[in-house]
Amino acid sequence: MSYAAYKMMHWPTGVDHCAAGFVTHSPSDAAAFFTAATVGPGPEGDIDSAAAASRPRRLGPSPNLVVAAANVLEVYAVRAETAAEDGGGGTQPSSSSGAVLDGISGARLELVCYYRLHGNIESMTVLSDGAENRRATIALAFKDAKITCLEFDDAIHGLRTSSMHCFEGPEWQHLKRGRESFAWGPVIKADPLGRCGAALAYGLQMIILKAAQVGHSLVGEDEPTCALSSTAVCIESSYLIDLRALDMNHVKDFAFVHGYIEPVLVILHEQEPTWAGRILSKHHTCMISAFSISMTLKQHPVIWSAANLPHDAYQLLAVPPPISGVLVICANSIHYHSQSTSCSLDLNNFSSHPDGSPEISKSNFQVELDAAKATWLSNDIVMFSTKAGEMLLLTVVYDGRVVQRLDLMKSKASVLSSAVTSIGNSFFFLGSRLGDSLLVQFSYCASKSVLQDLTNERSADIEGDLPFSKRLKRIPSDVLQDVTSVEELSFQNIIAPNSLESAQKISYIVRDALINVGPLKDFSYGLRANADPNAMGNAKQSNYELVCCSGHGKNGSLSVLQQSIRPDLITEVELPSCRGIWTVYYKSYRGQMAEDNEYHAYLIISLENRTMVLETGDDLGEVTETVDYFVQASTIAAGNLFGRRRVIQVYGKGARVLDGSFMTQELNFTTHASESSSSEALGVACASIADPYVLLKMVDGSVQLLIGDYCTCTLSVNAPSIFISSSERIAACTLYRDRGPEPWLTKTRSDAWLSTGIAEAIDGNGTSSHDQSDIYCIICYESGKLEIFEVPSFRCVFSVENFISGEALLVDKFSQLIYEDSTKERYDCTKASLKKEAGDSIRIVELAMHRWSGQFSRPFLFGLLNDGTLLCYHAFSYEASESNVKRVPLSPQGSADHHNASDSRLRNLRFHRVSIDITSREDIPTLGRPRITTFNNVGGYEGLFLSGTRPAWVMVCRQRLRVHPQLCDGPIEAFTVLHNVNCSHGFIYVTSQGFLKICQLPSAYNYDSYWPVQKVPLHGTPHQVTYYAEQSLYPLIVSVPVVRPLNQVLSSMADQESVHHMDNDVTSTDALHKTYTVDEFEVRILELEKPGGHWETKSTIPMQLFENALTVRIVTLHNTTTKENETLLAIGTAYVLGEDVAARGRVLLFSFTKSENSQNLVTEVYSKESKGAVSAVASLQGHLLIASGPKITLNKWTGAELTAVAFYDAPLHVVSLNIVKNFVLFGDIHKSIYFLSWKEQGSQLSLLAKDFGSLDCFATEFLIDGSTLSLVASDSDKNVQIFYYAPKMVESWKGQKLLSRAEFHVGAHITKFLRLQMLPTQGLSSEKTNRFALLFGNLDGGIGCIAPIDELTFRRLQSLQRKLVDAVPHVCGLNPRSFRQFHSNGKGHRPGPDNIIDFELLCSYEMLSLDEQLDVAQQIGTTRSQILSNFSDISLGTSFL
């Protein structure tokens, strides 16, 4: 293997940074949402009244939430659901049954846009000037000194780069002052009034970013086509301040403070650095200095300063007005400073103050604030999220602008947070790398009536490991009240000046959660609970799942990940030659039952030449002979009409309308409705149903419309004249129903009264109006043109010329913009030649348009091409100014009514393309059966199912598409939903092998994630996991922090000499009554129960006090006594007793009990103490390889003893061991990797070669490509290197040195590689491959793979990769080649070969338009189909789960 491909399969989920701001709208836009709903506050005495609880007293304009996870940037909108006043009966039960707080019954995060960047986000802020009609700008900082500003562009419904600032390269080399390595990347902060921003780069270089004057904006002004209702803050220029020239040598933090005419920057710096071991001589070494920034004069005089701050000060918090000033956060104290006053608060007994200081107030409880995250809930209350997961409230008690004191109170518990931000005045967000990130609503004065209802539920902390894995996945309404209780916060012994009372009354409700599976320390590969032992081929991979060690401390969990869905099977029957299935409802009258809970009445099965009908009652019973359905031929489509009172069955030559089982009308189709009855019947190719209309596409390409009459429940046939006179052939068509009393598409009309964000609820009682304008017909012609018509008038309201090309933006051609015309001209010159290759071959075969539930939801448009490509578009509304619209004359067939055509068109309707990871690359016949089936409730989820050779679920969660393939049954011919007594919100599908299966989605999994995930709370930190296949057990190392009395801890160390060297004051009587937190380790053996998917701890192996389990592995050893192989559980441990005690550890071996009735699942068969920490174990040809300290020993097993037979001295500390045949690969913590071989004849471990460089290894593994063996290592600088052993090459120093085959910067710490055999693809002749890819997990929660590829594929894709660097505009202006270069972090390194393909960059090729794809492929000398075939082969070959 000379070449490899790097591919991310599950993107990072651990939140590093978060911020809130009005990015997609201005405060004045958002205020329009709440003007009608917001009621003014009542008098003071009315706070506890029942009426005050149900009305929104504090809900104001809600800003956006911006979240960064490694290189993933996401922008969310907070969607709050207000409770109906006076119990209004029209509200949906799901939206008001949640706990009501401040008039809000529920809230959720809805995705606006997201991007995967070519660089990790080091810091983030939102630049806002506070103006009512101005939007905020997102400022991102990247290594080493790159800053990018992004603002939201309504024209594309996404972020656009407004400015870039780079201080790298030769001209800025002097800024580093000779240094090559920096502990932190740039840190960026914003002025509260948006006048400027500041970024600290290279440790001591302050970059000042000057904001432009009001009205200057890239999006708002420079683009003539964009007319925004509000412009965003924009950076005009930047300049540098050298802090070294200001006598600063060690800057810790900085912040802009409030209340000054000019921006004032306060910098926390250390004059003379010290550390904890020298605090007796140097303790108060920090100080703060406030600089007034004059950007015009580029001057920055010091206006005030404060010295003698503790050395452990690490963070500044600017206090909001009217107080102003700054809080200095230290590990053991909090200090407030302003230009005129100061005060402090001691947090524990470790805090100290300079001599002569006034008396300092102390906190009522002991706490440490190092590594705490903070955000302001109001102008005088700041919330801290501590390193232990506690939430603390600090109240700044003030009189006027004079701060009198600081009061700290305990609040609830929360997740271990990595970032915190307030969102408006009702929410805050806890971002976490170690647990699920939470959206929390808070309220100061919740009424007693509300709190009584909430406190009756079980009490719980605000933690991410409550049952969120199953519940927090859909619209968080009624499910949230079960997992979070809200109770009034009460604090004892607190005096109540200013807002102290409100701090006491703060109540919380967790409203939503973002699932996080990071950090992935280790994972194992095992069988699922519902695995099929008879599965063959690629479908067999759906039997497996990843069981991962996630989280830390109380947020620790076992994350069970599945790349594909394997449904829970209820029943299965053989049904050959099935062509389609449908379920229909039947109502004899309009009942009060909600539509979502109504059971299906009939199952219609279309066979090759007949139709079966089954009743879906308690049992599926065939009623084909007793119903009036047309059963003598196959059915084309079936569905409900007239409010589910009738069933429509469409077959080849006609259609029937049925009332239950009785036919009420039969229609026969002819070529045209106007022709005589003697006309020859015309066959129906496909049909689309949208009550009360049925659209028919005939075999000859014509279109007919069946129009329903609600009064008589009958249909009439209409052939639209616009298509009769048209010469264009129709390739695909569908109907779209714009549901609700406020149809979404109607708001995009040019003559509609538009108000940003009309917030009426969607009608949920089934009585929505049947306005004809709610139904639209979408037609795509063979030429590629797409048109949207009103039904039944068939007046064209939207038209796009080249839909099948997959442009990034779809705009009505009647109101095309100037810049789009100019863009199109770039490709006109190449279209003629390129169209010869693909223009005639690429066709649309199926269309679908659907708007799923949700008050703010928008329609999705899907187009399936005949090569398997699924085009996905999301609709949005954009109102362009009249002066920027270029009128384009319509074609004669473009509209039936030219009079007033401009006013009737959906001129404000646009679609932006959404990336969707569908790997199917199959040739789909033009007249094949439908592949797309939409669903509104399958297991509580909504979306669509894509049948075919590579079936996939496309679930709509938070207005985001989540793609989950279903490969367990091979190709799927037909799919439909089923809801009855025995199958609640399930589904039915028919496989290509002729089996009909009734299934449900596994309820234990959360599908609102990159992969379906189940999180099993451990309430401890998981470290390592392994899999015992014979009994499907998962041994797992878990550590739990335990608080013990200090005297008990010391007594356990009595046999160690360290206890005699302790100072007398440490072992005094008072000190011995203190407590000490120690981590207690144990090995839990977990089993996945077959029914329900619940995990149970079958056995626990406790470790001794101060004994840390470092490794657990299943090993197969050859018993030299019995001459048999034994499968044992091997555990390696280390005693952690401080630096003064010699390291030692133990090796433990356990056997598994075969009997099911045995009380002891495992039995200890061997235990021996080692002189060093046992960090890794592995089995090598029946021997046990043990890494103990700086030595590797190979041992043979006699059944009772381990006997050493060979050893090798490692440099420092072994972090990983890998075995292939008789070869050994191990990674050292500082000295890179070593390649050994085991020779049984001479009983020796001999060194073959090693890497002579310095490398801090994280993980190692072998990469196998046929007969070629490569060695892979990940390091502490987030790189991956591939080495190979070539003793015959001169560069290898006679075979002593491992040579570099490839190197690559991943951007994350990879902690585990797992070698898995690649799957065969259609291009390979043999059924089995001898290629093995490496599946890896990283600390950011990402999962990916490194796969070997052949040279021809590599050359082709490398050429494409180099072309895409220039051909694709990259978000934030980041260079992908620069990001993927090896990062040596200042160490000497010789660049290696560039032999890895970056699929993160290559995936942007599929998002190019068809013309651009053909153009790029032609320029690199290949074809589009060949490139997409290579993509598909690699995706199929790495579908391990």
UniProtKB/Swiss-Prot annotation:
Major localisation: nucleus
Subcellular location as annotated: Nucleus
Xref: Pfam families: Beta-prop_RSE1_1st, Beta-prop_RSE1_2nd, CPSF_A
A GO term from the CC aspect: nucleus
Keyword tags: mRNA processing, Nucleus, RNA-binding
Molecular function terms from GO: RNA binding
The UniProt record lists the keyword Nucleus: yes
Origin superkingdom: Eukaryota
InterPro entries xrefs: Beta-prop_RSE1/DDB1/CPSF1_1st, Cleavage/polyA-sp_fac_asu_C, RSE1/DDB1/CFT1/CPSF1, WD40/YVTN_repeat-like_dom_sf
GO BP term, pick one: mRNA processing
Subunit structure as annotated in this protein's UniProt entry: CPSF is a heterotetramer composed of four distinct subunits 160, 100, 70 and 30 kDa.
Family (UniProt): Belongs to the CPSF1 family.
Protein purpose: CPSF plays a key role in pre-mRNA 3'-end formation, recognizing the AAUAAA signal sequence and interacting with poly(A)polymerase and other factors to bring about cleavage and poly(A) addition. This subunit is involved in the RNA recognition step of the polyadenylation reaction.
Protein name, UniProt field: Probable cleavage and polyadenylation specificity factor subunit 1
